[in-house]
Each structure stands twice: as C-alpha cells, then as structure tokens.
Curated annotation (Swiss-Prot):
Localization per Swiss-Prot or TrEMBL: Cytoplasm
Lineage summary: Bacteria, Bacillati, Bacillota, Bacilli, Lactobacillales
Domain of life: Bacteria
Gene name per UniProt: murD
Residues reported in the UniProt entry to bind ATP: G119, S120, N121, G122, K123, T124, T125
Gene Ontology terms for molecular function: ATP binding; UDP-N-acetylmuramoylalanine-D-glutamate ligase activity
EC number: 6.3.2.9
Key words, A-Z: ATP-binding, Cell cycle, Cell division, Cell shape, Cell wall biogenesis/degradation, Cytoplasm, Ligase, Nucleotide-binding, Peptidoglycan synthesis
Reaction(s) the record says it catalyses: UDP-N-acetyl-alpha-D-muramoyl-L-alanine + D-glutamate + ATP = UDP-N-acetyl-alpha-D-muramoyl-L-alanyl-D-glutamate + ADP + phosphate + H(+)
Principal place of residence: cytoplasm
Protein name as annotated: UDP-N-acetylmuramoylalanine--D-glutamate ligase
Organism: Streptococcus thermophilus (strain ATCC BAA-491 / LMD-9)
HAMAP family: MurD
Annotated pathway: Cell wall biogenesis; peptidoglycan biosynthesis
Primary role: Cell wall formation. Catalyzes the addition of glutamate to the nucleotide precursor UDP-N-acetylmuramoyl-L-alanine (UMA).
Any GO BP annotation: cell division
Amino acid sequence: MKSITQLENKKVLVLGLAKSGEAAARLLAKLGAIVTVNDGKAFEENPSAQSLLEEGIKVVCGGHPLELLDENFELMVKNPGIRYDNPMVARALEKEIPVWTEVELAYLVSEAPIIGITGSNGKTTTTTMIADVLNHGGKSGVLSGNIGFPASEVAQSVTNQDTLVMELSSFQLMGIESFHPHIAVITNLMPTHIDYHGSFEEYVAAKWNIQNEMTSDDFIILNFNQDLAKELATQTNAQVVPFSTVEKVDGAYLENGGLYFKGELLMHADELGVPGSHNVENALATIAVAKLSGVSNQAIKETLSSFGGVKHRLQFVDTIDDVKFYNDSKSTNILATQKALSGFDNSKVILIAGGLDRGNEFDELIPDITGLKKMVILGESAPRVKRAADKTGVTYLDAKDVADATRIAFEQASAGDVVLLSPANASWDMYKNFEVRGDEFITTVERLKG
C-alpha cells in the first residue's frame, strides 16, 4: 500500500456502510483521518457499525441527521448507492465538501496499475474474463470494485507486480477526482439508471469520468458498434483502441467468424466458452486488454475457450435490470454456501437455499445469512433452514422448486441486487444432481430475460 499523508488529521464522514463503506472507514482510519460513520440502520441491528465502534471509529446510526454536517467535515466518502439528491449529500455539496466514493481511495493507495471496466451491460463478465486472461498469462490480475470485493480493501494488499481489475458502476464513477486507470474499458452505453442520473446524457457523463485523468500513455477500449462510442473517441487524451462485431477496426474485431486483433486471428467465435453475441463483444474487449498487457495469443485462446465452462460453481449467469444472477448449485453443504456469501454485500443478496434433508441444523450458517436482503427457501430441509433464518430476522419466502424460487427472487430484487442460488444442501430431494438443479436456474434466468 502506498504511504500517503493527504488525509492525515482530516475530518471525514463515511455515509452508508455495507462492505464498501466499512472498508473505506477502516482504510481512512489507517491513513490517519478522523473518521465518523453514519448509517441509517439502527446500531443494535448493525454489526458493521458495532465492529467499527470497537475499533475506535465514531458511529452515528439509525438515521441521517443533517446537523451532523455542522462538524466541519473536510471530506465525505459515500456509499455509491446513495443518490446525490439525498439531503446529506446535497448539504455536503452546498458546503463545498468534496464527495468521493471508495474507488478514489483505492486509487490513492494502490501500488498496482488499474484496469477499469464500466458500461451498461457485460461489465461483470468482461471484468472476470480480463482477470482470468491476465492470470493465465502470468500477469496477476486481482478482481475488485463493483464485482463484490471492495476496491479500498483490495487495493491495500496489491503490489506493483499485480494489476487491479476493477468493475466500476456509474454511481462509483461520479465520486472520483484523481482516479487514473492505465487501461479503461466501456463495454457499451444504454439508457439505464436514468432515475439516479436524471438523463441519459448525465449517465454517459458519469461513465465518461473514467478517462478524465488519462493521458496519451493510457488506453481506452470502446465499442465501435455504437456511434456514441465513436463520438466519445474524439474527446479523450487516451489512445483509443476500438472493438466491433460489425466492422473491421484498428483494434479487436469479428470477421467471418474469427476474432482478430489488428489483423491477427486469435480464435474463432464458436470456440468461446460462453455463448451469445454479447459475449463475443465481451471477448473482443478482453482480447484488446490482453494484447495491450502482453498476454500471449495461446493464453488468450485457452482462457476464453474455457471461460464459463465450470458451471454451477459461483457461476455468473446474467444481469437483468441491473440484478445479477449467480449459480452456485454445487454448494451442497454449509461451508460452500458460507464461501459463496463471503464475496457479496449481504444487504444486496437474495439467497435461494434448501434441498435434501440430511437431519442437520443450520445454526452454523446464522452469522453468514444475517443481514441478507431476503431468502427464498425450498426443499425437504426448508423447516430447518427457516429455523436458522428466524434467529437472524431475515425475511424469507417459500418456493416449490428452483424455477419458482428464481422467479420469486427476481420479483423481490431491486437494481444492484444479487440473486444467488447457493443451496447449502444436496439436490436429490427434487433433482437428479446439482447440475440439473443449476441448469433449471440458468434456464429460468434466460426466460426471465426474454
């Protein structure tokens, strides 16, 4: 971690906890800032706040009192999900207090160069592809950001031998100042999150912040299937590397079923481990990053051919209306589900659990399911899983099978949430094996997407 002094003895308000807020508060304290955390959840129901208080960090819970801002804070670090019309944020801006998100902190302390990936669709898949390709090519890509690993936490442990591969939302990119990736990727730009940003133009502007500090030594990878991307390409200091599935470009492109980079054939589209035209675009963006990073053609082909091939093991399935679906049907025991949940912010997770009743109780799972947004419970073991859920106060709903559970979970989800199938039970009460169970989840997600 870089040793920085600019935050020493500065009064900083962290607004909103969850994993990113908790990580930011700890990092700020480590950097010598005078930290106050403000979270809407009551202290008694807020293990994160309790933990921070034990570490000597001031916490104010149960609401967002505007008078808190009378304490002459010099910086606010807010949870990206909190809108800018929130009274606390609006008041901070009125008082000319800078408002950051935790990715700015991550940049300040990271010794590793950053590859930042944003866009409307395909962010998570592309981010994961890039990290996998770098690692297979011997380059050490470390996942962080909106993919479930707080950037400000991960950034503390990387070195200049690593590369931070960071998924970035428009919400996060609104709160940056000096953030400077060496390579940026914008997968595509579609009208989403207009309720948050107010207009498509403001949404695009937030995404475009990713390149604000980039120079001619840096690279931005843009989807030239879109005229908007071609227009934006004229408005950056970074070197533009385009990708396209509809035309030959000076970058990565699809031609006669082949995936090329600057005239060189790397592989064929039908060799990709994941189907769909959107995944061809994701693969082309990944190829561009990999070639700029010095990864061999063989490593690129091997990674992209096998990507997505290991199904049912915390497999990212798709995103619908900004709700991410993960298939972890292989989680047939409590430990596996504990590992799956450890990578997510519980307040955003709707967990689908239950299956074969082996007579065991689920008390071991209580710390891990505490704070979940909701659970959808099914199978023979449902009464036992519910007993554990009752001890946490988590709301749960019943489902007759995985398809029903997936539909119910999606109905309960909001933008930014995760629907996670991680049953903590074997499948044999309803399904031949965990593969069949996972396939039903995948098929249902496909039907929901239409």
